[in-house]
Curated annotation (Swiss-Prot):
Name by which UniProt lists this protein: Pygopus homolog 1
Chain positions of motif Nuclear localization signal: 35-41
Subcellular location: Nucleus
Disordered: annotated segments: 1-71, 175-265, 284-318
Subunit description: Interacts with BCL9 via The PHD-type zinc finger motiv, and thereby becomes part of the nuclear beta-catenin/TCF complex. Found in a complex with BCL9L, CDC73, CTNNB1 and PYGO1. Interacts with histone H3 mono-, di- or tri-methylated at 'Lys4' (H3K4me1, H3K4me2, H3K4me3); the interaction is enhanced by the interaction with BCL9.
Comp. bias (Gly residues): 18-27
Chain segments annotated as coiled-coil in the UniProt record: none
Annotated region (Interaction with H3K4me2), positions in chain: 339-386
Listed Basic and acidic residues bias regions: 1-11
Protein source organism: Mus musculus (Mouse)
One GO CC term on file: nucleus
Zinc finger (PHD-type): 338-396
Matches recorded under PANTHER family: PYGOPUS, PYGOPUS HOMOLOG 1
Chief location category: nucleus
Amino acid sequence: MSAEQDKEPIALKRVRGGDSGLDGLGGPNIQLGSPDKKKRKANTQGSSFPPLSEYAPPPNPNSDHLVAANPFDDSYNTISYKPLPSSNPYLGPGYPGFGGYSTFRMPPHVPPRMSSPYCGPYSLRNQPHPFPQNPLGMGFNRPHAFNFGPHDNSNFGNPPYNNVLTQDINMPGQHFRQGSAENFSQIPPQNVGQVSNPDLASNFAPGNNSNFTSPLETNHSFIPPPNAFGQAKAPLPKQDFTQGATKTPNQNSSTHPPHLNMEDPVNQSNVELKNVNRNNVVQENSRSGSAEATNNHANGTQNKPRQPRGAADLCTPDKSRKFSLLPSRHGHSSSDPVYPCGICTNEVNDDQDAILCEASCQKWFHRICTGMTETAYGLLTAEASAVWGCDTCMADKDVQLMRTREAFGPPAVGGDA
């Protein structure tokens, strides 16, 4: 049987490929069969390789096969741009490009009706969450601490407001007070939706609370601890201490009658501290023109009071020299502007950017009235040799446009007037 089986393929090979056995081994029959084997091998090898990634470039790229991020492709956006966790304070899910174009979403523990009093018509735009998802972290992250977009930054997100609020955290036996946002940390998570909602709705609605006139006005509704009173003086240039000393005990007693026994000693000590330090604080932080005149008379100087807001960066020897150029302004009454603006004729206050016309008229001008940018104002005040002239003086031909560097001493500038 084995011999017959060996003869049959040889006979078949002779019929197909030729008479000799060598033709069967190396003849055209193997050449005819080899392309089929190669095709089968190619098919099996091609299927064994995994398919290329849909985001990988094609093997032969040309102008018809460009792989780029399509901002209008929804399927590509949802895969590539994943929303970041809400614990990141600077890249919340409300920012465009991170998490898609989502609407304004409130945390689950805050009712949705709270968004209308302080967000207004901007509640459905791309804005970060007003509070983080964790209720224990409320009021401590600066991007979430009542910072509701560019229109409300001046009211709810300024550093003086947040710095003063965070000084009242370590008060013993303290409960949720009116106008203090850091006390969310002392409220349990299950009570946040019940306790914080009425107070927030009454504090941040412009029409409900008459005391909430400005972000610094809410500083009257709580009292900082005694050891932090020295820190509270710097970021409060606008606070009226006569109202703050009399208003805080009344508000605390009316808002929290059950806690009078625990907070009365603290209130009394804080009021005493305010009365002791009131003179120094008023001299440093007063903004009205009458306070400027009284400070000038009391100190016996002709210079304007110290600028409380960022004046150390912009105040130069040239700036201090400019203050001493107007000795006749010293005897004016408090009703008249001490330093009137040459354009709007309003008072030039300490915290406002002002420019002195050293070219001729020696008048003060608001930076906003002159149209000068903050960058140009910073360069002007940083350069001691720079001289600015108003439009009226520059229109006259009598102004000396070229000066030597030695002519910038105080006698030379006083002689130009």
